[in-house]
């Protein structure tokens, strides 16, 4: 047996409570393992530990599995009647049988030895307060990211002197200010609602000298270029009237050059009461020769004008947690995204969650983390992270023509086995953002653009369909993007109306095994009912037998799915009819 391919631990994404009654258990094996059984029971079923008892447990097969590139992910859900569980595994290959315990592998012969210890896996107790709980509304949310300065100018009276004319087309410079503001967002809420959007994610809106606002000057003040507190309150109120949620962007890894505590440090040096609010290794700082790159102090990247905040300092944690609490209590925001979330202290994240969930248990706390983020997703820090690995994997399938539909299956399964199921339900799925090249700019073929969107809309989690160019309102109103808007809106409304598209259960058939560039997967429901997604990424047309109700199609003629064609259909099993 391929022993190196086997792995399990009785915590994190391998063993965790889904709710107060159900425990999910996962184990990875090599492809040589053909069958997995779990032997499980209550730890005290045979008496108190250490009393010479013989504990046997009950054997159950694990039948659900997902294929990874080099391993198989086996999964089962059990209901421990007394909220605790003791277990081990039986692994069967073509010609071998091994038992897998916490301390390793045991042969059948060793199992028969009288008195030999069995160091079983144990989940001690399913404490309700330890169960990761995520906001249920998020999986039903389609987010629209707004970079305020480039979205819509609704109040010219607050335009700064250096504002430039709105540019519907062409490139923009990062430092240019176009005058987009909160009033402009309010004006366009009905447009977003009609599109199918029910969540708005705003990049930072606090006072800052830049247009992007990730170099905050005053965390307690709305940037005057965007409006004021009353305007933002009105935005939240008007959004809520339309059943739309609002999420703010919090920048607590670093601040801007003009943040008052940093200015105090620059003026007073080591005598400043705020000196320990930052990560300074040497004083004075030599800005002329790159103080950050010389290691004199830590910053975001190596930008000297974005000093890194010391979230190890209790005073810093309290200051920013109080700021966030005010956003929730005063503005009634629904979500908070943390910028550069993997660099702030875990203690800050834990304290922030405890405070905000006390105010609003249903608030959505999202971290910007580009890699595997399990250490932040154990139920006591973030609800979710931005699912960059999924978006990049989907785009890679179109970029790398050597990838097959089997590779696609492997990568989707990898993305959805990294975390717990309740986390997967609320991951922030995206194909682009203000930090990346826009998908439409990167994908010259409009058909491929729609194909990638169709795949993403069928994934668990919430979705963001919107680099920093101005919204081309004149072109939109003139109908220049009519087809694109209609197609995206159809996908959004389909996602909203079809529960199976938001579900967790995937199945990857092999109906197109002879054409490796055809993506096919099913989102499973009850009694053979499922939604099937077929995307033809090959260079040839394919035949797709008629079946079920067509929910969405593009470049599909009768039973022929053309190159870059999309077919989404629902098949209802006899038991659901």
Question: Where in this protein do the model-derived segments appear?
Answer:
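Loop/helix patches that line or flank the sugar-binding groove of alpha-linked glycan CAZymes
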Residues: 138, 154-178, 188, 410-413, ...
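Aromatic- and glycine-rich beta-strand/loop motifs that create alpha-glucan
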Residues: 32-81, 92-106
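Conserved, mostly hydrophobic/aromatic
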Residues: 27, 146, 192, 202, ...
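Active-site-proximal helices and loops of the catalytic beta/alpha 8
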Residues: 236-244, 254, 259-269, 329, ...
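Non-catalytic, glycine-rich low-complexity segments
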Residues: 1-33, 111-129, 134, 510
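Substrate-binding/active-site clefts of carbohydrate-active enzymes
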Residues: 141, 147-198, 205-325, 330, ...
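C-terminal beta-strand-rich structural cap/linker in extracellular carbohydrate-active enzymes
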Residues: 29-31, 85, 557-577
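Hydrophobic faces of well-ordered beta-strands that scaffold small-molecule active sites
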Residues: 142-144, 200-202, 246-248, 336, ...
């Amino acid at each position: 047996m391929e022993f190196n391919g086997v792995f399990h631990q009785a915590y994190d994404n391998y063993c965790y409570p889904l709710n107060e009654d159900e425990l999910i258990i996962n184990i990875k094996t090599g492809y040589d393992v053909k069958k997995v059984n779990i032997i499980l029971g209550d730890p005290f079923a045979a008496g108190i530990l250490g009393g010479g008892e013989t504990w046997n447990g009950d054997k159950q097969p694990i039948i659900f599995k997902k294929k990874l590139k080099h391993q198989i992910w086996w999964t089962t859900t059990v209901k421990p009647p007394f909220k605790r569980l003791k277990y081990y595994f039986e692994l069967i290959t073509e010609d071998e049988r091994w038992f897998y315990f916490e301390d390793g592998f045991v042969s059948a012969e060793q199992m028969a030895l009288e008195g030999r210890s069995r160091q079983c896996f144990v989940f001690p107790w399913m404490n309700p307060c330890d169960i990761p709980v995520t906001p249920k509304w998020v999986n039903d949310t389609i987010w629209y990211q707004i970079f305020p300065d480039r979205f819509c100018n609704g109040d010219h009276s607050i335009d700064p002197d250096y504002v430039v004319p709105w540019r519907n087309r062409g490139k923009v410079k990062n430092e240019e200010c176009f005058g987009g503001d909160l009033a402009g967002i309010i004006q366009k809420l009905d447009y977003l609602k009609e599109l199918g959007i029910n969540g708005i994610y705003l990049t930072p809106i606090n006072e800052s000298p830049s247009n992007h606002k990730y170099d905050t000057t005053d965390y307690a003040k709305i940037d005057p270029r965007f409006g004021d507190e009353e305007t933002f309150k009105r935005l939240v109120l008007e959004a809520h009237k339309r059943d739309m949620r609002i999420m703010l962007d919090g920048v607590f890894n670093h601040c801007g050059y003009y943040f008052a505590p940093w200015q105090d440090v620059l003026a007073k040096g080591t005598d400043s009461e705020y000196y320990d609010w930052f990560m300074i290794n040497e004083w004075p700082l030599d800005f002329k020769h790159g103080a950050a790159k010389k290691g004199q102090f830590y910053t975001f990247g190596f930008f000297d004008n974005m000093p890194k905040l010391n979230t190890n300092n209790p005073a810093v944690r309290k200051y920013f947690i109080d700021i966030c609490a005010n956003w929730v209590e005063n503005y009634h925001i629904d979500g908070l995204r943390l910028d550069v979330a993997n660099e702030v202290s875990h203690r800050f994240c834990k304290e922030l969650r405890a405070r905000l969930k006390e105010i609003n248990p249903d608030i959505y706390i999202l971290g910007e983390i580009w890699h595997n983020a399990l250490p932040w997703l154990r139920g006591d820090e973030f609800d979710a992270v931005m699912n960059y690995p999924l978006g990049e994997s989907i785009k890679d399938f179109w970029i790398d023509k050597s990838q097959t539909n089997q590779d696609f299956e492997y990568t989707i399964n990898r993305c959805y086995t990294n975390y717990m199921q309740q986390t997967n339900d609320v991951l922030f799925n995206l194909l682009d953002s203000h930090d990346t090249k826009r998908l439409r700019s990167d994908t010259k073929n409009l058909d491929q653009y729609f194909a990638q969107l169709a795949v993403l809309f069928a994934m668990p989690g919430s979705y963001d369909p919107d680099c920093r160019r101005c919204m081309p309102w004149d072109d939109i109103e003139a109908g220049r993007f009519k087809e694109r808007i209609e197609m995206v809106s159809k996908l959004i409304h389909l996602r909203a109306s079809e529960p199976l598209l938001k579900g967790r259960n995937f199945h990857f058939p092999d109906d197109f095994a002879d054409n490796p560039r055809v993506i096919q997967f099913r989102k499973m429901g009850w009694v053979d009912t499922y939604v099937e997604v077929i995307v033809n990424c090959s260079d040839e047309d394919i035949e797709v037998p008629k079946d079920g109700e067509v929910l969405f199609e593009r470049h599909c003629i009768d039973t022929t799915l053309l190159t870059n064609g999309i077919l989404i259909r629902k098949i209802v099993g006899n038991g659901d009819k």
